[in-house]
Design a protein with these regions (language model features):
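Catalytic machinery of carbohydrate-active enzymes
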Residues: 2-3, 20, 196
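Short, surface-exposed acidic
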Residues: 14-26
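Soluble catalytic domains of membrane acyltransferases
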Residues: 44-217
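A transmembrane-helix-recognition feature enriched in membrane-embedded lipid enzymes
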Residues: 1-12, 28-48
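Residue-level signal for short amphipathic helical patches enriched in basic/charged
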Residues: 1, 17, 94
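General structural signal for alpha-helix termini and helix-helix connectors
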Residues: 12, 16, 212-215
Length: 217
């Protein structure tokens, strides 16, 4: 699967590594990718209890604490780490809160419908990325108790290449849409730090980026 792309990216990201080391990384990537595919398909029948045991959210009380301080809506940022698809079920630990996931529709309609089904099976909702700002303004206005999950490492569209930085030895554009939305609506931002414990088991530690985005540079 996309072998030439994988090899090109590994070589550009780790120029100091030998050919043997790059092949080891390549093998590790494909092993993990295979696990990701199998685990994601498992979402079609895994129980919520089993999912939350395998994708363990360490400190969900952070959201409860912020809600007690008067906040009703939050932005959760995470990357394509571990198995990000599994954490739609883990976030049901947020009591009395709706879970929304911002997603980019797939070109293949059948696969798009499949992934929406898997992501919403435990009661969360999907919002298309182009509708994110409008829908979040509505959620804020309606004072809906909710958390909104963004994948922070998506590549921006050509019209939204506003912020660049060096990442893995390459100039890389990053999304700044969530930052603009958080500042405009004054929504707390939390990063979900994902770790792989062992095969088929992950943990997420919630780390507060800011509870006062309008005051954050």
């Amino acid at each position: 699967y996309r072998l030439n792309v994988v090899r090109r990216n590994l070589k550009a990201s780790f120029p100091e590594k030998s050919r043997k080391e790059l092949r080891q990384l390549e093998r590790a990537f494909y092993l993990h990718f295979t696990d990701y595919v199998v685990e994601t398909m498992k979402l079609s029948h895994i129980s919520l209890e089993e999912l939350q045991r395998r994708a363990f959210l360490c400190n969900p009380e952070m959201v409860d604490q912020l809600m007690n301080e008067g906040h009703t809506c939050f932005i959760l940022m995470m990357g394509h780490l571990g198995n990000w698809e599994w954490f739609s079920g883990s976030t049901t630990r947020f009591e009395d809160s709706r879970i929304y996931q911002i997603y980019r529709p797939l070109n293949n309609k059948a696969f798009d419908e499949l992934f929406i089904h898997l992501r919403t099976r435990f009661g969360s909702y999907c919002i298309k990325k182009n509708d994110a700002a409008r829908d979040m303004i509505r959620l804020k206005h309606d004072k809906t108790r909710c958390v909104v999950i963004f994948l922070a490492d998506q590549t921006p569209s050509k019209a939204n290449l506003h912020y660049w930085t060096e990442f893995l030895h390459q100039d890389t554009p990053f999304l700044n849409g969530p930052e603009r939305i958080a500042s405009k609506l004054d929504l707390p931002v939390i990063y979900l730090d994902t770790r792989r414990v062992r095969r088929g088991y992950y943990t997420v530690d919630m780390k507060l980026i800011t509870s006062t985005p309008r005051e954050t540079p």
